[in-house]
């Protein structure tokens, strides 16, 4: 009985920690519009809790899409070096003041519209950066944590300004997340 009560209490805490079912992202630039993301709290509870906390604090507002590879994905979320108006030369190298989150790999496939957490070569290094898939990328399956899916606005995602070269670095003025709101 104690385990049942403790489990219910932990589940209730986890639900209030994340406190969200999605994100509303208002994108500006070559792409203009709103993207709705359904967060998969049951798949990646720690990652969802971290990104919703960052979103609720306004950390993602004004952050650019710094790495965008045609036919693959658009990456954003560098709240340290990726803010509009800053020196974007280091965009993609930073994170938040929060600790990195351990990997929460799942069997959810990387299909078009799936949202995953960016990380370094260390699987336990995801922090604030995430990416949205333009197309399927099943070679990522089980290698990167899935946190959500686009439910509305994939056409807006598909219009995000593309980067150049093999690394997809965006030259000039990148598109950005003007406002990111946690939805219930």
Language model segments and positions:
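Cyclophilin-like peptidyl-prolyl cis-trans isomerases
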Residues: 2-7, 15-184
């Amino acid at each position: 009985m104690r385990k049942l009560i403790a489990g219910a209490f932990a589940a209730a805490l986890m639900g209030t920690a994340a406190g969200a079912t999605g994100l509303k992202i208002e994108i500006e630039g070559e792409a203009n519009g709103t993207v709705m993301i359904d967060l998969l709290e049951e798949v990646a509870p720690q990652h969802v809790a971290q990104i919703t906390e960052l979103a609720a604090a306004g950390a993602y507002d004004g952050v650019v899409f710094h790495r965008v590879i045609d036919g693959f994905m658009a990456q954003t979320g560098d709240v340290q070096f990726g803010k509009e108006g800053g020196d974007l030369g280091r965009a993609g190298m930073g994170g938040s003041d929060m600790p990195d989150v351990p990997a929460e790999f799942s069997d959810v496939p990387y299909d078009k519209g799936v949202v995953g957490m960016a990380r370094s070569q260390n699987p336990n290094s995801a922090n604030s950066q995430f990416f949205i898939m333009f197309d399927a990328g099943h070679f990522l399956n089980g290698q990167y944590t899935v946190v959500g899916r686009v439910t509305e606005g994939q056409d807006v995602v598909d219009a995000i300004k593309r980067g150049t070269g093999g690394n997809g670095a965006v030259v000039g003025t990148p598109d950005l997340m003007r406002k990111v709101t946690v939805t219930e």
